[in-house]
């Protein structure tokens, strides 16, 4: 039975899944919006929300925790200096999912995952 089992496997082992989610979180933080599948977006929401909450603390330990997930100090700097201060008035709900419809090749549901303060240019 699958009681109390949280999260999606996304067809990957744990190490691959964690690296993929960290990379996708970095891309979302850098660009403000990414196009992905619905399942990946729903998993990524939690990762990004946790990272932004960590970034709001803005201390050395918080930066080290963020580097552990994001693996790129430039992205961490962007998160702490630009993204987190903009979202300081919120306590959660930093992302939104916009559905785009099925992908041409395999029919997977495509979505935009974006930060709520992202301005479309």
Curated annotation (Swiss-Prot):
PANTHER family per the UniProt record, alphabetical: LARGE RIBOSOMAL SUBUNIT PROTEIN BL17M, RIBOSOMAL PROTEIN L17
InterPro entries associated with the record: Ribosomal_bL17 (IPR000456), Ribosomal_bL17_sf (IPR036373)
Protein name stated in the entry: Large ribosomal subunit protein bL17
GO molecular function, one term: structural constituent of ribosome
Record keywords: Ribonucleoprotein, Ribosomal protein
GO cellular component, as recorded: cytosolic large ribosomal subunit
Quaternary structure and interacting proteins, as annotated: Part of the 50S ribosomal subunit. Contacts protein L32.
GO biological process, one term: translation
Pfam families: Ribosomal_L17 (PF01196)
Annotated family: Belongs to the bacterial ribosomal protein bL17 family.
Gene: rplQ
């Amino acid at each position: 039975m699958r009681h109390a089992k949280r999260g999606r496997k996304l067809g990957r082992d744990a190490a691959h899944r964690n690296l993929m989610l960290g990379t996708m979180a970095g891309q979302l933080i850098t660009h403000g919006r990414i196009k992905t599948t619905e399942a990946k977006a729903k998993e990524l929401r939690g990762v990004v929300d946790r990272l932004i909450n960590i970034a709001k603390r803005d201390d050395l330990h918080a930066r080290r925790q963020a580097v552990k997930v994001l693996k790129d100090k430039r992205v961490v700097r962007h998160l702490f200096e630009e993204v987190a201060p903009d979202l300081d008035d919120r306590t959660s709900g930093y992302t939104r999912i916009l559905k785009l419809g099925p992908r041409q090749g395999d029919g997977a549901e495509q979505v935009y995952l974006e930060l709520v303060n992202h301005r479309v240019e």
